[in-house]
């Protein structure tokens, strides 16, 4: 099945452009019946914060993404949540543009890797909105 998403740029707050771009990548890679928001509070790492061990492959995608953003901040002095970048969604993959080592390219590669990981990982309904105090220590 092919999902078609009509995305308008008029309502994008500039300070959150990267999050919009990441959301668009996720929409491109996940199954049609899912929404990007279903990934925002999943497991121990998908969403704000994170602790403990990832509970499955999908949660591991978010764990790796958190660490990738952490490296971008610490090693490269980037701000991943506001950093915009150039990319293309084409032929079932995502292409990041920009010179290697630039903040835009580093953050794009973090988001690209995670979005593709989401597309290749099973979504387990029981891992949405879990009790993180109990399962993520």
Swiss-Prot record:
Needed co-factor(s): Ca(2+)
Propeptide residue span(s): 10-17
Disulphide bond pairs: 44-136, 46-62, 61-117, 68-110, 78-103, 96-108
UniProt-annotated binding residues for Ca(2+): 45, 47, 49, 66
Location of the protein in the cell: Secreted
Active-site residues (renumbered): 65, 111
Keyword Signal found: yes
EC number, as in UniProt: 3.1.1.4
Enzyme class, broadest EC rank: hydrolase
Any one GO molecular-function label of the UniProt entry: calcium-dependent phospholipase A2 activity
GO cellular component term, pick one: extracellular region
InterPro entries: PLipase_A2, PLipase_A2_Asp_AS, PLipase_A2_dom, PLipase_A2_dom_sf, PLipase_A2_His_AS
Residues spanning the signal sequence: 1-9
A Pfam match: Phospholip_A2_1
GO biological process entries: arachidonate secretion; lipid catabolic process; phospholipid metabolic process
Cofactor annotation remark: Binds 1 Ca(2+) ion.
Tissue spec: Expressed by the venom gland.
Swiss-Prot/TrEMBL catalytic activity: a 1,2-diacyl-sn-glycero-3-phosphocholine + H2O = a 1-acyl-sn-glycero-3-phosphocholine + a fatty acid + H(+)
UniProt keyword annotation of Lipid metabolism present: yes
Organism domain of life: Eukaryota
Job description of the protein: Snake venom phospholipase A2 (PLA2) that inhibits neuromuscular transmission by blocking acetylcholine release from the nerve termini. PLA2 catalyzes the calcium-dependent hydrolysis of the 2-acyl groups in 3-sn-phosphoglycerides.
Subunit details: Heterodimer; disulfide-linked. The A chains have phospholipase A2 activity and the B chains show homology with the basic protease inhibitors.
Record family assignment: Belongs to the phospholipase A2 family. Group I subfamily. D49 sub-subfamily.
Protein name, as recorded: Basic phospholipase A2 beta-bungarotoxin A5 chain
Natural source organism: Bungarus multicinctus
